Amino acid sequence: MNVVSTERLLLRPLEWADREAYAAFRFHPEVARWLSPVDRDPLAASEATIARFQSGWSTRGYAPWGVFCDGRLIGQCGLNFVPEFEATEVLWALHPDFWGKGYATETARAALAYGFDTLALKLIFAMTRPDNLASQAVMRRLGLLYRKNVVYKGMNAVWLDIDRARWTG
């Protein structure tokens, strides 16, 4: 199992037992507004997401982790292959109680290190809605550069990326 510890957090693959805690964080109204909408119940959606993440770990050797603080699931972060772009993204989402504490930067930095140093990926991108300035600030803090606007799952997004040569950890 691919477990990563940061200075303050534990990142580990999500398990079936995490599905209710995952649904509670992921479909919190302040989190859901930034992510793609879901047209089914939160528990079913969290079960499908955990199954997809587990498949990513099995087939690619990476997928988003659950982010744990003092044993509590507070979010997700990690690498995600996006077939529509044939590229790997770094993503994060945290429960609002944990915003503004530097956790997004801390976990995304760990995910980028895993992608470049462990998996030897050549390029990692991130995308978010144009009005999500907090996530864009995290991206820039980590060295990602704006490249283009894209449409993903019907939503407008900005695309920033970083390549292994520019990654400084």
Predicted regions, residues:
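Active-site rim helix/loop that mediates acceptor-substrate recognition in acyltransferases
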Residues: 42-60
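Acyl-donor (CoA/ACP) binding surface of acyl/acetyltransferases
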Residues: 1-34, 51, 64-169
